[in-house]
Amino acid sequence: IKKEGLWIPKLEPERVVSILEWDRAAEPEHRLEAICASMIEAWGYDDLLNHIRRFYLWVLDQAPYKQLSAEGKAPYISEVALKSLYTGKPATSCELEVYNKIHQEQHDEFDDSQMKFVFQSDKEKLNVGEQQKSKDKESRQRDQEGENSNRQIIPDRDINAGTTGTFSVPKLKKISGKLSLPKIKGKGLLNLDHLLVYVPNQDDISNNIATQEQLEAWHEGVKNAYEVDDQQMEIICNGLMVWCIENGTSGDLQGEWTMMDGEKQVTFPLKPILDFAKPTLRQIMAHFSQAAESYIEFRNSTEKYMPRYGLQRNLTDYGLARYAFDFYRLTSKTPARAREAHMQMKAAAIRGKSNHMFGLDGNVGTDEENTERHTANDVNRNMHHIAGARF
């Protein structure tokens, strides 16, 4: 809008009003700051600014804002300050005289010698040197407390909800101080404070699952090998997951894998899938475990569906079909019955299987030197003759 010859970028009045409607402030002071922010944004809309000021005056008469106003903690933005903020022109003495005259009229019962002004910044003057010494002292105290954290735990002396009169409910330590912890030269190797808050996801540190970097490298390698974009790769991953549910993730797989496009079969080479799968394809597909589990549940909601992995093990309980694939990821939340069924199927799948480190050597010929000496009296080339005796 144009104000006093200047074009000023402004929000729409509705956006300014939405600032007033913001009521998720944690402290009453934050609510007052939001109203002052709306005043700043409303400058240029004279009617809107007037209504905001009247609303602010009404708010300061309500609890708990009335107490903040009495303590001088309620912020105020004058018209002169807003004008100077937007135009960059400093306030003149005539404009400031208006506020000075009103202030004197409100305090006409006091003379100049009795009038006392209180500013919001009521902090004492700070000595930089003393402040730095205080910080160094506090830092040394914290370091000393950190060294003694493994030896002594200071009890909390604050009154809490468990306190009744002069009696307090004892608090048990999460980690006992009597534990035998590893130490070097008398200093503990563990940070107990960090250990109490270190609760990583089991999947993130499990050796049975490929790391996130390995999964990303596999995805990027397969995508480049198939020469597809990210959206097409999503469809390929869908088909690969369903194919692996039926056919497994053995390292002996070779040839091609298949997915359906309507009634038409579409084949893809398995070589890129296996080549970029580090450490193994089963560890890569473990990231798809929960998605595969949900997919089997979805199929069973419309028809009886048992993956081939379960059919081969003669699994008759369709309630366990969701666990009948070889890249299923066991977790702490897996039911005991499902865990037993999965482990039995896994044991049956690997029963009698043997892996040979070396195959048959292709160079099967033997080069031997025959050192046997025969004479004309020998019976044949394999038998000797000595004085009529045959050996």
Curated annotation (Swiss-Prot):
Pfam families: Poty_coat. Genome polyprotein of potyviruses undergoes post-translational proteolytic processing by the main proteinase NIa-pro resulting in the production of at least ten individual proteins. The P1 proteinase and the HC-pro cleave only their respective C-termini autocatalytically. 6K1 is essential for proper proteolytic separation of P3 from CI. It is an enzyme of class 2 (transferase). This is Genome polyprotein. Transmembrane segments: none annotated. One of its GO terms (molecular function) is RNA-directed RNA polymerase activity. It catalyses: RNA(n) + a ribonucleoside 5'-triphosphate = RNA(n+1) + diphosphate. Residues 127-145 have a biased composition (Basic and acidic residues). The record marks 120-121 as: Cleavage. Belongs to the potyviridae genome polyprotein family. InterPro entries: DNA/RNA_pol_sf (IPR043502), Poty_coat (IPR001592). Keywords: Capsid protein, Nucleotidyltransferase, RNA-directed RNA polymerase, Transferase, Viral RNA replication, Virion. Residues 127-165 are annotated as: Disordered. GO terms for cellular component: viral capsid.
